[in-house]
Amino acid sequence: MVNTNIRPDEISSSIRKEIEGYTQEVKVVNVGTVLQVGDGIARIYGLDKVMAGELVEFEDGTVGIALNSESDNVGAVLMGDGLTIQEGSSVKATGKIAQIPVSDAYLGRVVNALAQPIDGKGQIPASESRPIESPAPGIISRRSVYEPMQTGLIAIDSMIPIGRGQRELIIGDRQTGKTAVATDTILNQKGQNVICVYVAIGQKASSVAQVVNTFEERGAMEYTIVVAEAANSPATLQYLAPYTGAALAEYFMYRKQHTLIIYDDLSKQAQAYRQMSLLLRRPPGREAYPGDVFYLHSRLLERAAKSSSQLGEGSMTASPIVETQAGDVSAYIPTNVISITDGQIFLSADSFNAGIRPAINVGISVSRVGSAAQIKAMKQVAGKLKLELAQFAELEAFAQFASDLDKATQNQLARGQRLRELLKQSQSAPLAVEEQVATIYTGVNGFSDKLKVEQVKRFLVQLREYITTNKPQFGEIIRSTKMFTEQAENILKEAIEEHIELFLLQEK
């Protein structure tokens, strides 16, 4: 028989212990209800105290961002497809804003807009995080741009130089080689101690894979992070991708390193933002873009900077890409981004189709930093180049109507055609600065005038090889002194004269 002798004092003491151990903890959660969901947008009732840009979490685990606070509901954009979110389900405010983990381990990886790996190489270890949207450096924490960011493309480094901490727009129609200019610049940073971030927004996954492939083949992934949101990604993630890229680049910039970030391209980000805004029923403005589309891009591009010496002189150079329709630079997004950036590289479809590649229109491309972002050697040889090309373009237009031209004009036209050849380069073949100096010197000083126009490009390729193998001291002088000294000029003249004889003999 079971002993049923229960002692009341034992019961009361155990109850007393339970009561003493009880902590009255009230957890306040801001909860709302889904009124409507669809097209990547959710309207939520409740959530009274939600902040603009705060993350909200749905019952199925989907995360959204609260963007619209109206009198009776909150409009949130979803960071997923939202197919399993049901009307009437609950939503809770997280009290956080969008943040991403950051670390050196991101180098060589392909991630999405939430900094999650999408390259199948496993998780990325990270000990700290940064907000996706962070304020741009103030005036005191910046200094003026003075170091060159070499792109490896003669046309840019000689006439439209880019400096570390500058924002240089690459603009042109589709299929004019905008991405090629950007990727060549990344390839040229090998060994320059520059961290590169390539942000692909709303592109075909195959195009992104091709770019990543090129980087891997050329060993550029060692210092590059790729942030990709393909065309089939939700608009919210396409809109966030550039800010994620900027946050990753800032992590390195504030650690006294130099970074280069490419946004490919901001037209697609603006379209994703327009889609979100229209679905949130925000009033449309010009070209149906919302009123704050300028702020969308200005707050992104203002994060590029050259840090002051107190902050360690790190830098973040931004190259946004914008696509134009039929060369119309006066559309809304192109004019906005032109006014925010420190210059633009304009790629023309006509030049591209005429076989001038990179198809840079030197006439209307500018760099508002200018020669401050060039080494002395480049300033010395490239000074006359832009002027000569501009005069040639003017003469060429005139020569179409005139039949008999005097000898001086014919010579100027011949020189101009050869200078145009000198600017042509193959894709993924960036040139070191000493090779560029040698190439420009050859053209500007008339050494290539003896050659036929179609021989110029081949001659210059061989000349660069000849100098590298037979006159290595030329490259050493330019690299060490950053100046085009008299000694360097004599070595170069000698090399050109020797090689021109060889070349003309071979061609016969």
From Swiss-Prot:
Keywords tagged on the record: ATP synthesis, ATP-binding, CF(1), Chloroplast, Hydrogen ion transport, Ion transport, Membrane, Nucleotide-binding, Plastid, Thylakoid, Translocase, Transport
GO MF assignments: ADP binding; ATP binding; proton-transporting ATP synthase activity, rotational mechanism
Positions annotated to bind ATP: 172-179
EC id: 7.1.2.2
CC per GO annotation: chloroplast thylakoid membrane; proton-transporting ATP synthase complex
Enzyme class: translocase
Gene3D superfamilies with a match to the protein in the record: 2.40.30.20, ATP synthase alpha/beta chain, C-terminal domain, P-loop containing nucleotide triphosphate hydrolases
Sites marked Required for activity: 365
Similarity comment: Belongs to the ATPase alpha/beta chains family.
Name the record gives this protein: ATP synthase subunit alpha, chloroplastic
Organism field: Angiopteris evecta
